[in-house]
């Protein structure tokens, strides 16, 4: 479990586009999302430092909850907690659940906002569609009052020449997730070549949404239910893992059913079916031609055998006739 305070230089860290934040001593943000969506990179953009290990790959980099902090120019402390990828919960992984629940220790004064991170570079997976259920299972219904959706890889929209609204029009599942958090969302571009000004703007927009969350919750942070002896107790973890396993089983069956239906009706499947049909017809035609050729060969062989027999008989008759003529010729000479 890592931790640390990253100081931001007042001269270079503050961008002209940023406004001073209300003087709340500190804010705590928690990053949640599937592996490879850019959670750690988003945390680094917020902290303005390479505080968390981050790699552009699907394999999980974050194995345990980590807390890193930065001091903003107005003196406010921003705490960012990075968590293991939710993807590792499927099939349910008790150790990952236990690790995520450690937020209760790292955020003892509560959480001001939960940042649910999705990547715009990839389609929404079945696991990601189940995120609302997983969050509800892990933290309870009230967690949605603190949820903000962060879309990473904003540059992919520019590459595809589409707006975020156009992108969401084709993603009804995203709309459902956004509806659960009152459509609070922000776009992030975490590339190294992204300008400091752009990064400052996106972080400021995020912090504006955090303020909105605070106002809606009367400045009360999300507090964990500590009625249990420990959030990571075996009983609590087992109960949550059981619910997630049951959910995953249902999703898997539905996913396989959808996949089979999609595959059967896909253009590729139809092409394959056409190829199989054509191949079958060709094989049938080849078999017919082969059978016809075999029949022709049989008839030719039979004719050859019959002709050979007739030639043999004719030859024998000629030989006998020749002998008869020779005998007659000899008889005539004696007389």
Curated annotation (Swiss-Prot):
Induction: Up-regulated by brassinolide, nematode infection and cold treatment. Down-regulated by aphid infection, 2-aminoethoxyvinylglycine (AVG), high CO(2), isoxaben, and propiconazole treatments.
Pfam families reported for this sequence: AIG1 (PF04548)
Binding site for GTP: 33-41, 54, 190
Region (G4): 152-155
Chain spans, region G1: 33-40
UniProt keyword annotation of Nucleotide-binding present: yes
PROSITE patterns: G_AIG1
GTP-binding recorded as keyword: yes
Annotated spans, G3: 82-85
Protein family per UniProt: Belongs to the TRAFAC class TrmE-Era-EngA-EngB-Septin-like GTPase superfamily. AIG1/Toc34/Toc159-like paraseptin GTPase family. IAN subfamily.
Official protein name in the record: Immune-associated nucleotide-binding protein 11
Taxonomic lineage from the root: Eukaryota, Viridiplantae, Streptophyta, Embryophyta, Tracheophyta
């Amino acid at each position: 479990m890592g931790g640390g305070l990253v100081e931001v230089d007042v001269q270079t860290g503050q961008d002209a586009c940023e406004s001073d934040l209300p003087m709340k001593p500190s804010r705590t943000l928690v990053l949640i999302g599937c592996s490879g969506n850019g959670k750690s990179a988003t945390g680094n953009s917020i902290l303005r430092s390479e505080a968390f290990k981050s790699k552009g790959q699907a394999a999980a980099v974050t194995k345990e909850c980590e807390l890193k902090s930065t001091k903003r120019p107005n003196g406010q402390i921003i705490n960012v907690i990075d968590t293991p990828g939710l993807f590792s919960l499927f099939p349910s992984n008790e150790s990952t659940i236990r690790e995520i629940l450690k937020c209760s220790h790292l955020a003892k004064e509560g959480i001001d906002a939960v940042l649910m991170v999705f990547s715009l570079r990839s389609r929404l997976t079945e696991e990601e569609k189940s995120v609302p259920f997983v969050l509800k299972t892990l933290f309870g219904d009230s967690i949605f009052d603190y949820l903000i959706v962060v879309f990473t890889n904003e540059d992919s929209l520019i590459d595809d020449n589409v707006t975020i609204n156009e992108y969401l029009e084709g993603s009804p599942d995203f709309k459902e997730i956004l509806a659960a958090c009152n459509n609070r969302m922000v776009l992030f571009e975490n590339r190294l070549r992204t300008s400091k000004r752009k990064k400052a703007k996106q972080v400021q927009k995020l912090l504006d949404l955090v303020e909105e969350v605070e106002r809606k919750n009367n400045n009360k942070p999300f507090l964990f239910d500590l009625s249990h002896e420990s959030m990571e107790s075996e009983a609590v973890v087992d109960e949550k893992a059981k619910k997630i396993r049951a959910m995953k089983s249902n999703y898997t069956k539905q996913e396989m059913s959808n996949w089979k239906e999609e595959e059967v009706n896909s253009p590729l499947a139809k092409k394959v079916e056409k190829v199989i049909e054509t191949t079958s017809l060709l094989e049938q035609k080849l078999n017919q031609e082969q059978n016809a050729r075999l029949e022709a060969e049989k008839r030719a062989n039979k004719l050859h055998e019959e002709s050979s027999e007739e030639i043999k008989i004719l030859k024998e008759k000629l030989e006998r006739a020749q002998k008869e003529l020779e005998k007659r010729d000899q008889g005539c000479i004696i007389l």
